[in-house]
């Protein structure tokens, strides 16, 4: 069987080897001698594969799943998520599709100047640095090695994992750069860009081989590529191949594309999907259905949405049940522990003391109109996804909470909870509503020595994505399967406390995916590839304007779901343990409070609502100032109702009023939201290839400079 599979793979490589790129890749490609040495034994192959995993960890951390391009584009460029500071840097130009493809902004944008990324640190360089190494393995592992009685299974697994690694790298390259160079063997010398449709076809062929060679997923091997990962990646790539993307018309012939009827071409690029898109959905359906029905060591908790995130915050070595692939981090390690995701898009913290979580920047923030007006108040995911408080600790009284200042607190003890006010300070006490899914307070033992070393893993692929991808494919394939779409949509929908639904549509699935992955950076790409980006951006802009106009006119605005945002909210310092709560890190919001416009009736309720916040249970809370540490948490009132009189014992905080102020001062919340884009032009959601990547006669498309 392995012999047959490898034979198919070798034939496929011969047929689908594509003309590829230039000097940049040619000079970084390994030699034939190196390939022979690396694949001369199982140990040599495994060492090469292990090195690729380490390189992929760097790419995930620095560019495609935490920092870099993920931080610039995915984490903050949708109707749900946005950046928290003023639009004064290069990354914010990219967030808005370069002000709708403004020719001056697009043509002058560079990765080095606008994103501060050196040529050798770009996603392009990091991912293309991995691909030639994988070509060593796929070129060097022979049919005879696969069939070896003693070592054949090991060679087969490494071969399959190498195919998965190449496919993963190309998937990310296409997502961020569009049409790129294809290099699938050691003999490929880049001479031209290759249409992403041809690359997708090659990846699909490779993954059909890999899924039969990779080992079965178990609870213990989720940090490596497995059979279930190969199937899920095949489904993910097939979905994207079927989807709307912005294509260079000088690379992909227009006859192969079906243009989106609502979007105009721009900069010799068109927003379209392949004419045979349904065939890709057929492939996605089969692949994702396999994983859904054969999850191996992955397990979906159908009752509790928080299980996955609780497990992510476990001790080193803890892998979430729902994960299919996690990038592992080790707490405190300067190499594997340098995890950027909790820092970049986690719950914000400003701290300068060992008795508090380390600084978390919290660059990705939640659009307030989405939080208030789009999330169903009954949805259990809202308060896990979106958080209105951060952690704060600084010596002295600068920025200290009013109640602590009055109590004479000197700022030298433990972290305390603060409101994330709507100012331009991206930190533990500003820039508005943030993502609450990655919160170092929730770790069993937070790391306090240095920021960015929490050890929290990065969840790259999990079952809920498989389920919702399957629901999408079921609706869009050649012969739609409504029953399967309903079944897998309802697995996540019901878990969120929203019951079940029949006859779901593609837009239902896209929206469900938005709620399921809110604050995780999935939304932007999902809206782009499903064709809903213009509709959803227009809707959130209109809702934001209504909110701001209402706040200006009346001091409050009430949304259709019953939630009200007012000019002010009110807080009070509390000690949860003195109120009978078991922890300072609060539980999910009690279901009885998950209704539109809920107002807490007691201080205890105001501490529990909204849930999933608070502070870590530092032992020092019990000993500081003879056991009289100032109150660590806050009770909140007026978050979803309009209260005009300050409740007894509470302090008033500008809330909606601060949104209006920022809009009047710098246009941040409405005017800058996808500033300049008309929701009708092909979205330029990509970034240019940097100068070194274009050596050899290549040119950027989409209006970007080519350094010529």
Residue ranges and their predicted role:
Residues 98, 105-110, 374-462, 695-708:
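Flexible, polar/acidic helix-loop-strand segments at domain edges
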Residues 204-207, 213, 403-454, 526, ...:
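Extended glycan-interaction surfaces of carbohydrate-active proteins
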